[in-house]
Amino acid sequence: MSASAATGVFVLSLSAIPVTYVFNHLAAQHDSWTIVGAAAVVLLLVALLARVLVKRKPPRDPLFYVYAVFGFTSVVNRIIGLEQDGIIDGFMTHYLREGEPYLNTAYGHMICYWDGSAHYLMYLVMVAAIAWEESYRTIGLYWVGSIIMSIVVFVPGNIVGKYGTRICPAFFLSIPYTCLPVWAGFRIYNQPSENYNYPSKVIQEVQAKDLLRRPFDLILVLCLLLATGFCVFRGLIALDCPAELCRLYTQFQEPYLKDPAAYPKIQMLAYLFYSVPYFVIALYGLVVPGCFWMPDITLIHAGGLAQAQFSHIGASLHARTAYVYRVPEEAKIIFLALNIAYGVLPQLLAYRCIYRPEFFIKTKADEKVE
């Protein structure tokens, strides 16, 4: 494959601009099932066009076509975000009203922007890596964590939230959106991981240091303990804990946790049942040397938390959230400090694991013991 294939995917994704404009005007004249069928045909055509782009030298990695289609949908989501902000008009108006009305929520707005910016850049990078036959395992795992987190919160939230009674046929488009990332995640994880060529002496010296002699790791451990408590606390709020502290926090700090849209509740439950176990495992990995799996799970978790906190913070402050559920003006500084710190911590841990991995490398002695 050549670099022109990656450029072709980029141009193909931009075709979403005229396609959505035409699609919106045609959709206004047909019923919901016709809209779903037409949308499915469009996505299939995008995949076929991506195949035509690389017909002479097709890629070895079939995920090339998945990223091409998802890149197209990322531009669609960016268009939705711009239309919701009133910057453009007439591109997705009918679809937002009749197809997926839950995208009009503050949370829906934020994930559209995340998908149309962060995910879009990841797709372009991964497509370029495939075209140049380079490894993209690191950014791939980060993307897997990000998109899986959005699926875990967004799809159930559409069903159990206030829009649960307005589920339209377009909801079935979520099926490939859910299945393909899971399949992609397994393929990315099974790609060869990076080989670190550190001298055995260096690895042994690093792994011989206890936690007190690794100040940055010690700070990370303390922060992980605090983050675990924060996760459990907000998880209890999502479970309607009657404690006075939970009530006061919800009333004066994060009233958005009680939003009937259900996205914040599901997000807190995802933190409780996903992040808390991860934090416990990460604490173990920072204390016990040779946990070779730490970089991978840390990347996945960092991607998930980046998407989750971007969406949660944005939706908590967004004008589309009812005033009574928005963060009070006097609480914004504390709210932002807590939530930004909580979102940055996994990124710092991922950076530490990827760029200073000596402590996590399995030594030959460990392999012999196994």
From Swiss-Prot:
Cell compartments where the protein resides: Lysosome membrane
GO CC, any one term: lysosomal membrane
Main location as per UniProt: membrane
Organism phylogeny: Eukaryota, Metazoa, Chordata, Craniata, Vertebrata
Keywords linked to the UniProt accession: Lysosome, Membrane, Repeat, Transmembrane, Transmembrane helix
Protein name per Swiss-Prot or TrEMBL: Transmembrane 6 superfamily member 1
Record-stated family: Belongs to the TM6SF family.
The EXPERA domain, residue ranges: 60-185, 216-350
CDD domains: TM6SF1-like
Membrane-spanning segments: 3-23, 34-54, 62-82, 110-130, 139-159, 166-186, 218-238, 268-288, 331-351
Species of origin: Bos taurus (Bovine)
Annotated membrane topology: Multi-pass membrane protein
Domain of life, per lineage: Eukaryota
Function field: May function as sterol isomerase.
